[in-house]
């Protein structure tokens, strides 16, 4: 859909950012799946759930007969917390959380190595968000599937992620393990995001000071920065002068 202006996208050691061979496309469509932001908009309203989930099986011929296909669909429904009889229903007959479970089932049935979850909980109620994220964690522990979890809710990002990358205006500003980013955020944009998270502890919440960040007035130029090592696997993109200044800042009080 878009031609990259710079950089490469590597998956399993193969460059998938440009034109791909048919074999690479087939491999990619088997090994990489997507969970979309809006569960209602991403499900065909005219198809039953069994056909929505089974579409990938049909395209890639992953079953021997109709009975095996039916069994695979019902097994994946059970894995995501839905009943086998839900297979014959249409998307409008489900709640938002249930529809997102259908979307997760559609991705999982292909046994992918990577699932890209694009703001997959932002359209759901808070209580339902927790259910969906817990489901995704359980599935990951069971199957070993990797997630690229795209979100703006950093409390959920902290809960589900092993590593975090902070993006702004198309630039990767800071990367590290969840502990490294949350314990020692360096970039002003990262600090502003983390300082905005309310604390459930009233004592900590009273001390919390939300930092503001405006790229236009910050004097920071993302194109001039280079990768600087903070510690371990924690890196920040900045100039030498910015790195020296930011490393002197006091730790945040946000948790």
What spans do the regions from the language model cover?
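Hydrophobic anchor residue at the start of the ABC signature
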Residues: 104, 116, 132
């Amino acid at each position: 859909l878009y031609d990259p202006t710079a950089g490469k996208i590597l998956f399993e050691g193969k460059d998938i950012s440009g034109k791909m061979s048919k074999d690479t496309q087939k491999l990619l469509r088997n090994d990489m799946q997507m969970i979309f932001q809006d569960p209602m908009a991403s499900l065909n309203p005219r198809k039953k759930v069994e056909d929505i989930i089974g579409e990938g099986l049909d395209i890639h011929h992953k079953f021997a007969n109709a009975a095996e296909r039916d069994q695979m669909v019902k097994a994946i429904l059970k894995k995501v917390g839905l009943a086998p009889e839900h297979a014959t229903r249409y998307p409008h007959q489900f709640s938002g959380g249930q529809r997102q479970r259908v979307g997760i089932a559609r991705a999982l049935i292909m046994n992918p190595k990577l699932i890209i979850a694009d703001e997959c909980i932002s359209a759901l109620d808070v209580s339902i968000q927790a259910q969906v994220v817990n489901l995704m964690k359980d599935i990951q522990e069971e199957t070993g599937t990797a997630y690229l979890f795209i979100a703006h809710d950093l409390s959920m990002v902290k809960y589900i992620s092993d590593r975090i990358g902070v993006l702004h205006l198309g630039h990767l500003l800071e990367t590290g393990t969840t502990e490294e980013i949350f314990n020692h955020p360096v970039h002003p944009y990262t600090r502003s995001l983390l300082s905005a998270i309310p604390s459930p502890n009233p004592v900590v919440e009273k001390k919390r000071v939300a930092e503001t960040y405006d790229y236009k007035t910050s004097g920071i130029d993302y194109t001039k920065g280079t990768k600087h090592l903070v510690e371990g696997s924690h890196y920040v993109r900045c100039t030498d002068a910015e790195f020296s200044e930011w490393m002197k800042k006091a730790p945040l009080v946000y948790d």
